[in-house]
Amino acid sequence: PGPDVKCVCCQDGKECPCKGGECCITGSCCKEGDGLCCGKCSNAACKCADGCKCGSGCSCTLGNCTC
């Protein structure tokens, strides 16, 4: 298995796990409990700049990104 992929949710800064790593394709994640999708993708190998929408020219501040 690859790195544990998470999304940093935009509302409160909490991290929540993404099912199937989908957040690194869509750039969003579903917040625990409320089902809202928001946030920016990150994982152990990549940290994206603010406003990054993975899949459309993600600019990475650290590491290499498949975005």
Swiss-Prot record:
UniProt KW keywords: Metal-binding, Metal-thiolate cluster
InterPro entries named among the record's database cross-references: Metalthion_4_echinoid/annelid, Metalthion_4_echinoidea, Metalthion_dom_sf
GO molecular function, one term: metal ion binding
Keyword ATP-binding belongs to the record: no
Pfam families hit by this protein: Metallothio_6
Coiled-coil region list: none
Span of the signal peptide: none
Entries under SUPFAM superfamilies matching the protein: Metallothionein (SSF57868)
Family per record: Belongs to the metallothionein superfamily. Type 4 family.
Stated role: Metallothioneins have a high content of cysteine residues that bind various heavy metals.
Protein name: Metallothionein-A
Organism, scientific name: Sphaerechinus granularis
